Amino acid sequence: MSCRQFSSSYLSRSGGGGGGGLGSGGSIRSSYSRFSSSGGGGGGGRFSSSSGYGGGSSRVCGRGGGGSFGYSYGGGSGGGFSASSLGGGFGGGSRGFGGASGGGYSSSGGFGGGFGGGSGGGFGGGYGSGFGGFGGFGGGAGGGDGGILTANEKSTMQELNSRLASYLDKVQALEEANNDLENKIQDWYDKKGPAAIQKNYSPYYNTIDDLKDQIVDLTVGNNKTLLDIDNTRMTLDDFRIKFEMEQNLRQGVDADINGLRQVLDNLTMEKSDLEMQYETLQEELMALKKNHKEEMSQLTGQNSGDVNVEINVAPGKDLTKTLNDMRQEYEQLIAKNRKDIENQYETQITQIEHEVSSSGQEVQSSAKEVTQLRHGVQELEIELQSQLSKKAALEKSLEDTKNRYCGQLQMIQEQISNLEAQITDVRQEIECQNQEYSLLLSIKMRLEKEIETYHNLLEGGQEDFESSGAGKIGLGGRGGSGGSYGRGSRGGSGGSYGGGGSGGGYGGGSGSRGGSGGSYGGGSGSGGGSGGGYGGGSGGGHSGGSGGGHSGGSGGNYGGGSGSGGGSGGGYGGGSGSRGGSGGSHGGGSGFGGESGGSYGGGEEASGSGGGYGGGSGKSSHS
């Protein structure tokens, strides 16, 4: 249902003759032009015309009537919901709710009544009675120029119409947007949903395995190359260390050789000293020999002189022998000393050489041992370095593998987070769309209920018109006729906005001696209760007073009970009369055991319940 189908105005202009029945054009169309009318002069059936609450006269109609709610809620001269003599009903004349000579909702007699009179409607009557009396809301020759719905009410109706149309437009637009979003969500799920994500990658498994094997082989080869490079570097370091150690060993041997050279120099110097001593002793020996020879020669020369001295002395020693003995003794001593010196020298040289050789062997053995130990240390250090390098390479490879897998895991986590965020956004969007859809659905249901209520009200009004007819509405039990929105019982004319026995909504009841109504109607007579909304017997506007006389019932919204034992009034109406039933919406029950009134109407004097927009009248009459 769109607002374009609702865009027709409630108040359309048309001319021509009246229609029949539920008529020519129908009361409910797709364009909802319910209150239009094509009435003009004359007309046959009830609730006829193109559509709306209008129609010509029927049986009781006087001169004829145009459809109500037409151009100005009126037609030619009469027409409407009910009429008595010349015309009446809900329209008449040229404007307003009154007819040319009659009008109003109902009239009890005379030329007119109800809401309009004269040539222009308003709330005043022409020659007939208004709300139960002669004048009603207005007397004289005519009333005001406006109808029952003022300009504000018309604008309100138009505004409500436009708002309803805009609501329906908005509902349709939101439904279309919702459908578009659902289609988009479905497309997204089809493209990027779990079904789209879970693709068949089985043909690529062999290629992936081959690539993985190649990656593993390349990684192993790379690691082997790195290990070879590290081993080569360690071997180079090993040779460098060996070179340094050999160089240090050579320097140590050179230092030992230099030390031995110093020892050899010392020994050579001692040998030279001993040789010098030997030469000195040889020279001394030669000097002693020379001196001895000279002394011997001197002594020999002295003995060769011619001196004869004869001395009687003891025989002397042989000096030659003594000298020879001394010479031999000295020679033996020199030889002994020389031999001792030579032996000592040789012994010292031998000892020194033995010490030098032994120390050299010890040095060589120590150097060999040191070299072996250094080689062992170097081998251990090389092995340690190789193990450390292998450990560092493996740790680096492990760290690279961890970093690579951590990066891949982080990428997967980011993808998962992005997908979760997208899913969360989609869920939130779906939730918002569901909330908006629920809200729009509730608004749509509420609007459909309101439209259904309008339909029911319209159909109820049509059924009441069809069932009761303009004639039944026009004739009361003992007096005036009961019109739409009210009815008469024992006196003046009944109906809303008019006084009667127990008028429905927008009106109050009046007894057998019905007085004039208050604002929009009032109750009086035989201890009648106070009027309903917008007036009453003694009640004020918009509030029903309590029932008077013989236990009258309390008034309801915009209405009140009246009469003896009257029931409580419903919305816009109230019960009246003895043991009157409770009033319905915009109406009420009335008269001696009357049943409860229906919407916009009520029963009277043991009659059945009134229908929508009308009510039963007369004794033993039924809706």
Swiss-Prot record:
Keywords: Coiled coil, Disease variant, Intermediate filament, Keratin, Palmoplantar keratoderma, Phosphoprotein
Modification Phosphoserine, positions: 14, 57
GO cellular component, one term: keratin filament
InterPro entries: IF_conserved (IPR018039), IF_rod_dom (IPR039008), Keratin_I (IPR002957)
Upregulation: Induced by intrinsic regulatory mechanisms and by extrinsic signals from a subset of dermal palmoplantar fibroblasts.
IF rod domain span: 153-465
Region feature (Disordered): 1-25, 462-496, 534-623
Region (Linker 12): 300-322
Region of interest: Coil 1A: 153-188
Chain spans, region Tail: 462-623
Subunit structure: Heterotetramer of two type I and two type II keratins.
Disease implication from the record: Palmoplantar keratoderma, epidermolytic, 1: A form of epidermolytic palmoplantar keratoderma, a dermatological disorder characterized by diffuse thickening of the epidermis on the entire surface of palms and soles sharply bordered with erythematous margins. Some patients may present knuckle pads, thick pads of skin appearing over the proximal phalangeal joints. EPPK1 inheritance is autosomal dominant.
Extra facts: There are two types of cytoskeletal and microfibrillar keratin, I (acidic) and II (neutral to basic) (40-55 and 56-70 kDa, respectively).
Family under the similarity heading: Belongs to the intermediate filament family.
Descriptive protein name: Keratin, type I cytoskeletal 9
Gene: KRT9
